[in-house]
């Protein structure tokens, strides 16, 4: 099948130099990332580096087909060109749109509505989810309601992040809706199972090689976690995803100052952010633009821990145990669907002896039940793809 893949990209799409019609032109190298300006630009391009896992997972699920990734910006920039959309409709049999928490009050899907209205082929929306449950329909922007209306009227398939999104879309009249979870969950199933097996180990509460993830620049929660779990002479490794553009983690130097070491993925420039004075451990800030480098680094950790879904999934893809702290409905929907062990943020935050609580929690995990649930979800995902013809 000739598949048009668009939406959230994998890290490989960082090499795209130009697009002409349906021909994508790639550079034989990645953009240089060394200065403050370079670093911020690379984060801004993807908005959140965790998104690369979504695009990568979607692409991997289409292996075996004739797949072309066309950047969504190319379709958007040429939405008034009948010639280009005639070419797209002629050359592809199916469109797969890699998505995330598109159903949210702060995002209006006007462009998606306009573009999908121009496609004559069926559309698969893969990985669509919500940000917050409360008042969802009443708060969705007009552009997003139009997007749903367009897809309701054509042959469309929705693979959702979880049950709530699926229920919501069915209420909107969508015919083919399957809760499948994020496609990143099925990128490397054997390693995911290895990670889940390793997690049921109380000794991990004493681990010192931990990759932390959270919302540095906004709240101090991750700093508190590091102090609770790490010994005074240990180094806290914090993985940045979108904090440089969304959560006021600022680089203080000039635009041309060296701020990033690509080999180690370490931010070397001086930073400034809320609560930074509270650190009582040495720490490093890391940011990855290559998912293979990211997985390689996580494979050397004892544990991935924190409030970022994909910041933990990348570790699981490397076979490293990972435990998430659920902070919002978006995370809860995905975690409840896939059945991974997790701790509610409100519960974790009020624990005074976090290390003891963690050891007790890990010791109670039913590994076989967790793996059985994951395997069932993977089978469900493959089955949904097969029903679509993928």
Feature annotation, model-predicted:
Residues 1-390:
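Active-site anion-handling motifs in enzyme catalytic cores
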């Amino acid at each position: 099948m000739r598949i048009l893949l668009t939406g959230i990209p994998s890290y490989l799409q960082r090499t795209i130099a130009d697009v002409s019609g349906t021909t994508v032109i790639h550079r034989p190298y990645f953009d240089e990332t060394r200065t403050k300006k370079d670093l911020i630009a690379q984060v801004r391009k993807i908005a959140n580096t965790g998104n690369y896992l979504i695009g990568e997972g979607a692409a991997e699920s289409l292996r075996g087909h004739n797949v072309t990734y066309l950047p969504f910006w190319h379709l958007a920039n040429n939405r008034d060109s009948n010639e280009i959309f005639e070419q797209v409709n002629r050359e592809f049999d199916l469109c797969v749109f890699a998505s995330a928490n598109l159903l949210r009050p702060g995002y209006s899907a006007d462009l998606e509505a306009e573009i999908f209205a121009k496609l004559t082929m069926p559309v698969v929306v893969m990985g669509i989810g919500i940000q917050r449950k409360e008042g969802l329909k009443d708060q969705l922007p007009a552009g997003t309601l139009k997007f749903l209306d367009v897809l309701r009227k054509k042959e469309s398939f929705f693979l959702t992040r979880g049950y709530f999104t699926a229920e919501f879309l069915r209420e909107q009249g969508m015919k083919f809706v399957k809760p499948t979870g994020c496609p990143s969950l099925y990128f490397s199933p054997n390693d995911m199972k290895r990670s889940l097996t390793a997690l049921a180990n109380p000794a991990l509460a004493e681990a010192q090689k931990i990759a932390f993830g959270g919302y540095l620049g906004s709240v101090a929660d991750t700093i508190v976690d590091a102090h609770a779990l790490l010994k005074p002479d240990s180094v806290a490794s914090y993985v940045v995803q979108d904090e440089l553009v969304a959560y006021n983690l600022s680089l203080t130097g000039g635009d041309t100052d060296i701020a990033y070491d690509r080999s180690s993925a370490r931010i070397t420039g001086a930073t400034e952010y809320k609560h930074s004075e509270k650190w009582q451990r040495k720490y490093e800030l890391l940011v990855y633009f290559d998912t293979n480098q990211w997985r390689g680094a996580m494979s050397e950790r004892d544990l991935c821990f924190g409030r970022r879904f994909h910041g933990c999934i990348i570790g699981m893809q490397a076979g490293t145990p990972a435990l998430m702290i659920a902070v919002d409905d978006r995370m809860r929907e995905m975690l409840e669907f896939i059945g991974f062990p997790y701790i509610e943020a409100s519960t974790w935050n009020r624990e005074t002896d976090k290390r003891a609580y963690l050891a007790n929690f890990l010791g109670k995990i039913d590994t076989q039940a967790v793996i059985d649930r994951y395997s069932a979800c993977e089978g469900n995902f493959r089955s949904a793809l097969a029903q679509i013809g993928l």
